[in-house]
Amino acid sequence: MAFIEKGQEIDIEAIKAATQLSPEALRKKEARDRELAAIISGEDDRILLVMGPCSSDNEEAVLEYARRLADLQKKVADKIFIVMRVYTAKPRTNGDGYKGMIHQPNASEAPSLINGLQAVRQLHYRVITETGLTTADEMLYPSNLVLVDDLVSYHAVGARSVEDQEHRFVASGIDAPVGMKNPTSGNLGVMFNAIYAAQNKQTFLYHGQEVETSGNPLAHVILRGAMNEYGKNEPNFYYETLLNAINRYEIMGLENPFIIIDTNHDNSGKQYMEQIRIVRQALLNRDWNEKIKKTVRGFMIESYLADGRQNQPEIFGCSITDPCLGWENTVALVEEIYTTLTK
């Protein structure tokens, strides 16, 4: 039992230097970041869509998706604000399987962490600079935040990480919105405790230093469904669950109440077409209840170029992890959301 060094110490600053945003690109990104913060704080009433592939497995496919998404964003910008999922690190339930671009920059080849770090930076950089969109990623490894903190505009803490103290404390120091998912058990209390920790100042050791954070008032809820002890998914996007979550926000006195519904995972049972029905149901609930309308203002949607999933990266733009909506279904869903909001 041991840790075996497989390479020299990685120079993060050298990796970052190759993909620094130009002053003009940074200005555009910061403008979009201000819009995103205004949406989460309630100053801007547009709907937030965090959408894109389950995992960013192929740079060119992801960029083709990003170009199309940027065009779609322009058409719906008065009602909908889109942040693109560029998820480069994937949690694995038992440690096996594809762990994301950071581990495997080429999904058909052996893992290479040093090349993976460079590939992650390059992908976020290219999406931002070539399309004008801003990006979201999962903070699977808190120690890697320094790799992307200047590029990523939205961070998610996943269902398997939300109970971890380091994830919570690092989230409290991020100068960007952080979505906290409910754990796989579905326990909302765990998620709200994570949000409380993230919204408050914390002191801890990080990268070999004692640090104090400012607290992150933009930490918020992502409801992703649950898995019970029998392996059956239990959705939590329903009317009563939403009111329960809103009530917890009120009881705990947390800042900027904001709920995103993750339309895939255990809400859909990974039946990707169910994402359409889930969005429709949530929009109906918003119309029915003013509290829900005020608080449930975001959706996380998994979509790519091709419908479904594949075991090997053979079809261009088809997921190799969870199944996703293809492009035609994605456009139809976003246009339906827009039409509903316009009524």
Regions found by a protein language model. Give the residues of each.
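Glycine-rich phosphate/diphosphate-binding loops that line cofactor/substrate pockets in enzymes
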Residues: A37-D45, I251-N256
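N- or domain-start disorder-to-order transition segments that initiate the globular core
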Residues: M1-I40
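Conserved phosphate/anionic-ligand binding catalytic regions in large, soluble enzymes, centered on
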Residues: L48-A61, D322
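Short acidic, Gly/Ser-rich segments with clustered Asp/Glu that frequently serve as metal-coordination loops
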Residues: C54-D57, N256, N264-K270
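Conserved, mostly hydrophobic/aromatic
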Residues: G52, I261, G326
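Internal helix-turn-beta structural module
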Residues: S303-L341
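Active-site-facing alpha/beta catalytic cores
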Residues: A66, K79-N244, R248, H265-K270, ...
